[in-house]
Amino acid sequence: MTELDNFSMLEASKQVPDRKESSQILADHMSGRLLQKRLELVEDLWETVVRSECPLEQVERLLRLKQLSNSSGIVGEEQTNQINEIVELIKEMDLAEAISAARAFSLYFQLVNILEQRIEEDSYLESISRGQEEKINTSIDPFAPPLASQTAPATFSELFDRLRRLNVPPGQLEELLREMDIRLVFTAHPTEIVRHTVRHKQRRVASLLQQLQSDEVFSLSERDNLRLQLEEEIRLWWRTDELHQFKPTVLDEVDYALHYFQQVLFDAMPQLRRRICSALSQSYPDIDVPQEAFCTFGSWVGSDRDGNPSVTPEITWRTACYQRKLMLDRYMHSVQELRNQLSISMQWSQVSTQLLESLEMDRVRFPHIYEERAARYRLEPYRLKLSYTLERLKFTQQRNQELSEAGWATTIERTNVSNNPDEDLHYCSIDEFRRDLELIRNSLVATNLSCEQLDTLLTQVHIFAFSLASLDIRQESTRHSEAIDELTRYLNLPKSYIEMTEDEKVIWLMDELQTLRPLIPSAVQWSKSTEETFAVFRMLDRLQKEFGSRICRSYVISMSHTVSDLLEVLLLAKEYGLVDISSESSDLLVIPLFETVEDLQHAPSVMEELFQSEIYLKLLPRVGEKSQPLQELMLGYSDSNKDSGFLSSNWEIHQAQIALQNLASSHGVALRLFHGRGGSVGRGGGPAYQAILAQPSGTLKGRIKITEQGEVLASKYSLPELALYNLETVTTAVLQNSLVTNQWDATPSWNELMTRLAVRSRQHYRALVHDNPDLVAFFQEVTPIEEISKLQISSRPARRKTGAKDLSSLRAIPWVFGWTQSRFLLPSWFGVGTALEEELKSDPDHIELLRMLNQRWPFFRMLISKVEMTLSKVDLEVAYHYMTSLGSHENREAFNCIFEIISNEYKLTRRLVLEITGKPKLLSADPALQLSVDLRNRTIVPLGFLQVALLCRLRDQNRQPPMSETLLTEGDIGRTYSRSELLRGALLTINGIAAGMRNTG
């Protein structure tokens, strides 16, 4: 029997439609209608503000532009006429009006973004309510599709109910919950393009919109007042500069990222725990969620120094101190609140002996607190204990401030010591603080009392500790090899490090790792680069000694290629006290980042050699009840995509995961895979739930680490319910993937088919991107890549090498950003159509097989879904306008050839995706998403034409000799203006298009 016969039997057996799937379809339709309804209010507000802020003539042109862009579905001559009218309207604008138009459309898209976030939040709350009702009213459906094939996000309640109905044993679920380790790592790049000041105004607008559009009953005057407040807030927003005037410092980026912890996540995480506990009690009442955190956070902001010279050891030190300060401030506030609440008197309640004994020790340690508070709290032991706790937190904050001000290189003597010189007044570790809180909790429980506020604080302590988020150090591999090479030259070895073969390097590094004598001499004047490399390790040692290893234990090596890349870092860590060979311990987790396709293919052989080393295995940390050595590996989506295209990159990562997991299991090593996913599809982005379910079965085992890029933080974590939705989505996906085996992953013929598709896709992609000699010029001229580099949104340079213009030096983020702005979105789909077509040419019947893969294999469905979504955002009419307007005359013929290649591939990919999905239009299976994308596609058109007009004039100016910066205010956009004003206009259009497309790079 063939696979297709099996598929037909499976389809025939589905007598009953899946209720969850039906409910999701209904919810999607409702979300679409809700968007249309609420959009009327937003558009009315937008038009009201624009009319009040712009001259009448400008308003009429602006509204006409929007009207023209809203005309969907027209083709042929009428479409050409529409585009011509848009171009003519833009030509009538002077620069001031063009800037106003760009700002107006940008404002519109950001209002729509706020609206959609609120609808997502409402839909999440509705799904929780709907899921509870369906659970009560729904009988077991034996014909429901396999759980591993469900890609609509599930709530905890829905997931646990389905697991119970699938007879997943309680013991298996309980073991997974104990082992579960989800880590979300915030990064600064690609940076959020919206200013922090503007974000604040957006939150205010979102709050007012929520009130105005809620079901709450308001009087007519109250509604009018809300409406006036909204108009006023949007007008204030309109008069606020959207552009960053200065390049942000690294500490600015730190402050921005930590904002989400302060405003949302600190309070959301205890709610997440309560939700999982509540849902678990309904389906698996005998299972308790472990107190240990199953989801924690990391950060690269302030510690990722790969290609960013602004991230120095001092910056990382100050970042750690700042994070600690925020946590201590929150804990002090919470302890004060608890002290107000726990007014329990010993006259009416017993207190544990352990608590009373601790009060006596505190009296000796803090006599001044005893003198101040003992009389007031004589019969209120909990308040007295919390007063001592608060005092220790204050001393901890004082110590943290001293360390921050002194810097990492200055040793600060212990000043906060009690009468006992071996006893610190401040908390030396989070465990000491947690023990004090648990002492209070245990005493309350012993007397049949509970305190939700205390439980909330304990949950926060387990998740955030004093560090808030663990800092990952990241550095490029050549920085370590160059530093060690300089060292070997100084030591005058027979061969310098760079001159050694890979085998010689490994032997020498292993020997030095086991040698107790120091290798790096002190008081040597190293080069600036080498000195900074060594200083990072010295700073890390100091940081861990002061704050504990949790603050900064992971060291990510970007562009990892070989075994020596990892051993170099271990050797440097050993030299500065982070690794102790004699005790077989390491305070540093060395994480290779495999980024290119070639490195992904070689990753298993690299790790095989390391796992065969007893020394290496002994230095890995231990996890779980079996105390297995843990190896973390990072997989790079961005550079592998830029290197070989979307389909090839995703398949190589998929294959690498399977090979690495099999290898780790054979050596008794636990594996945690770190996914370096970006915000855009071209850098591994897309729906998290779908992406996690698409991971190969058996590779997660409850452990996953994922980057959360700067550009998506606002869309995921700006509102409490949005944050909870994202966190619940990730958690349920990890549980689902880990517990329910997806049988389709192990189908050999499917893997062979995917390998063929990946090879063909890679060949076609590389033929254009790497082998076509005109592609670099096309990208430089036809996209706003040079202007993007002038946006003051990131502390990191756009290129790895200053002055280089080749693609290899260009980072993946601006690579994707440029293609997105010009509406090609090429990195996210190019090569897929050709691969599919060549497969079907070899066997036309494989179209049925591809349809089956799309229905039954989460990985393949994820690929097709991402390509479909990306194709829906491509606009070749706009892209063609970029090419014809911005491309130089001498390159016209070559550029036309490139555009024809892209256009043909787009049409081919679109046709075959629709054949595979069986849908008449892109996104027709998701009405809400289709409506949102269609709305943005139409309304964004004028911004693209505005951008082209401004770029044409700006680039003409740049080709002229320097001239006066005086702005001529009369005339159309084609007249003479200063470079700075033209650049400002162009940057505003970049902001607006980024808001409309909802991502940068």
UniProtKB/Swiss-Prot annotation:
PROSITE patterns: PEPCASE_1, PEPCASE_2. InterPro entries: PEP_COase (IPR021135), PEP_COase_bac/pln-type (IPR022805), PEP_COase_Lys_AS (IPR018129), PEPCASE_His_AS (IPR033129), Pyrv/PenolPyrv_kinase-like_dom (IPR015813). Its cofactor is Mg(2+). It catalyses: oxaloacetate + phosphate = phosphoenolpyruvate + hydrogencarbonate. Its EC number is 4.1.1.31. It comes from the Bacteria. Coiled coil: none annotated. One of its GO terms (biological process) is carbon fixation. GO terms for cellular component: cytosol. Keywords: Carbon dioxide fixation, Lyase, Magnesium. Belongs to the PEPCase type 1 family. NCBIfam families: PRK00009.1 (NF000584). Forms oxaloacetate, a four-carbon dicarboxylic acid source for the tricarboxylic acid cycle. This is Phosphoenolpyruvate carboxylase.
